[in-house]
Amino acid sequence: MKRSIFFDLDGTLWDAINQIKESWNLTMERLDQPFSFSFDMIKSIMGLTPLETLPITFPGLEEEKAMKLFQECVKDEIKFLSKKPGTLYPNEEEVLASLAKKYQLYVVSNSDVGYVENYLTSCHMEKYFKGHVCAGDTKLAKWQNILYLKEKEGIDEVIYVGDTLKDKIESSKANVQFIHASYGFGVIENDEFKITNLLELPQLVDKLFNGD
């Protein structure tokens, strides 16, 4: 039986809020645009698809123009993060190395093209992951990307690890088990399965896959 763990990225595998905020504000300066981004604003769009971010980041701007600005931000962000990557969570590489010996690991994110790749390369994590998919690749919702990747890779069972209520809802739509990374950005009431740090993940994953 092929068992896999799918990971969200922001708030689950790294925290890049400060880097994104700095990069996007530099982009607005470069383009002489009146928009600016605070820490809280960037945090509020973590986990949203590109289209979902536009009314928050570029309020009052028509979608086509907002998307062009968003794409400029993302283009600069990719370059910025390659030199100044997000912050990994404690014990992350140790945990991923352990999990990768037993399960196949993937990243499923609502990010745009290039963002997941940036995490994998700049943090040297490619060796632990079998693949990834993002909203920018497919233009699909996260639950659809979960099912797409599951079918594409011939996976029998999936556990999704994410930090937000949206992640939990998307996992439910895809009919896969969800683990709340409560150290991340989101708050979930009545979360059935959660971890407060990554060191707790291997034991909980083993328990859920073995039906204990």
Place the predicted regions along the sequence by residue:
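Short, acidic loop-to-helix structural element flanking the phosphoryl-transfer center
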Residues: 79-107, 117, 143
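Conserved phosphate-coupling serine/threonine residues in phosphotransfer and NTP-handling enzymes
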Residues: 12, 109-111
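Short beta->alpha linker loops
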Residues: 19, 49, 87-91, 111-112, ...
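N-terminal helical cap/lid subdomain that shapes the substrate entry/recognition surface
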Residues: 2-90
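Structural motif corresponding to alpha-helix initiation and N-cap regions
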Residues: 36-39, 51, 89, 93, ...
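Asp-based, Mg2+/Mn2+-dependent phosphohydrolase catalytic module
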Residues: 1-3, 113, 119-212
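Conserved SAM-binding loop
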Residues: 6, 13, 105, 160, ...
